[in-house]
Every structure is written in structure tokens, then in C-alpha cells.
Design a protein with these regions (language model features):
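An amphipathic alpha-helix adjacent to DNA-recognition modules
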Residues: 8-16, 28-29, 49-73, 88, ...
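N-terminal intrinsically disordered/low-complexity leader segments
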Residues: 1-9
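Helix-turn-helix
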Residues: 2, 13, 21-55, 59
Length: 197
């Protein structure tokens, strides 16, 4: 049992250190050797845990998204908030996490461009990584409609509406290099109020 725990602990440490390398170097310039050096281990040891840098990158992003989902689920389960407040708080929490991980977002964009050049659809990768987040947004909307707190509309339309704020946030931070999302925060708050009864 201790061996499994140690293996999982080492794997998590590798992922944490790999994120640092990806943020410093970008996806294309990050190498297995640089990740091993950051971890303080030999490259051959790194191969015991991961087969290549793409696998490390995917697991690193997955780990980050799990942390995001934990934050969001804690808001979602807060009984003291109504549906409008929950959705607003979730979007604002996501905005804050995106601002804190601006550099990582640039690496993700770099990775998606790299995939596209390899002939792999970035859209499929993004959809797979964001399906849980979209599900959480949809379920909060459905709950709000059932509770009589939000206007009725098609769930997919509501999901797309809410998710578009996240896409706008990423675009503003990575492509237009905005320093913060203060204007988008105000717009999102206003827009979510329009969903309320």
C-alpha cells in the first residue's frame, strides 16, 4: 500500500513541476529533460511515470481542471445562495482562476495550435476537457428553472450563453492580453440577472 501512495505522490509532484516548465518554456519548447531537471530526477525515472511530454501535459491540465471543478462544486452545493447567485459566483470564480493562470492559458493555446498542425482537431480536445464544466453550468440552470428562480429557455442555449463568458474571458486574457476581466465581470453579472425571474 505504501508503494502505491508514494507512486501517486511522486506522480503529482511531477505534474506540479511539469506545469512550471510548460509555463516557462511553452509546450513546444518544454522537453522531457527540462521536466526531469525541474523535478530533480533522471529522465529515465520520468519514463516510469509518463510515456511522453504530451501525456504529462494532458495529465497536468486534467489535474488543474479537477481543482477548478472542486471550487465550482463547493459553490454549487452552497444552500445559502439562490440560482442566480450560484451561477454568478461560479463564473466569477472561473474568471479569477483564469486570471491567476493566464500564462498557463497561453501554453494551452500553444498546445492547441500544435495539435492543429499535427492534424488533430483542437475542438475535440477542448470539448472533452470542458464537458464537466458545461454539465455543471447546465445543471445549475436546470435547478434554477425548477426552483422558479430562472426564466425557462432551452438548456443548450443557456449552457452556450453561460459558457460564452468563459470563452470571452480566455480570449481577452490570452489573445488581447487584457490585464484583468473587470469589464467582463460587470457584463456577466448583468447578463445573468437577465435570466432571473
Amino acid at each position: 500500500m505504501a508503494i502505491i501512495v508514494e507512486h501517486d505522490k511522486r506522480r503529482k509532484q511531477i505534474l506540479d513541476n511539469a506545469l512550471i516548465v510548460f509555463m516557462d518554456e511553452g509546450f513546444v519548447n518544454a522537453t522531457f529533460q527540462k521536466i526531469a531537471d525541474q523535478c530533480g530526477i533522471a529522465r529515465t525515472i520520468l519514463y516510469l511515470y509518463f510515456k511522453n511530454k504530451k501525456e504529462i501535459f494532458n495529465y497536468s491540465i486534467k489535474q488543474l481542471l479537477l481543482n477548478v471543478e472542486e471550487n465550482i462544486n463547493s459553490v454549487r452545493s452552497d444552500k445559502s445562495l439562490n440560482s442566480e447567485e450560484k451561477i454568478t459566483k461560479v463564473l466569477l470564480t472561473i474568471f479569477k482562476l483564469l486570471e491567476q493562470n493566464r500564462q498557463l492559458l497561453s501554453v494551452v493555446l500553444d498546445y492547441l495550435v500544435h495539435l492543429s498542425k499535427e492534424g488533430v482537431s483542437p475542438e475535440d480536445r477542448v470539448r472533452r476537457r470542458t464537458v464537466k464544466l458545461r454539465h455543471i453550468l447546465s445543471s445549475m440552470f436546470i435547478e434554477g428553472v425548477k426552483n422558479g428562480e430562472l426564466k425557462k429557455m432551452k438548456v443548450k442555449a443557456a449552457d452556450d450563453y453561460l459558457y460564452s463568458f468563459i470563452e470571452a474571458a480566455i480570449f481577452q486574457l490570452v489573445v488581447t492580453k487584457r490585464k484583468n476581466l473587470s469589464e467582463l465581470r460587470e457584463t456577466a453579472i448583468f447578463a445573468i440577472k437577465q435570466l432571473s425571474l
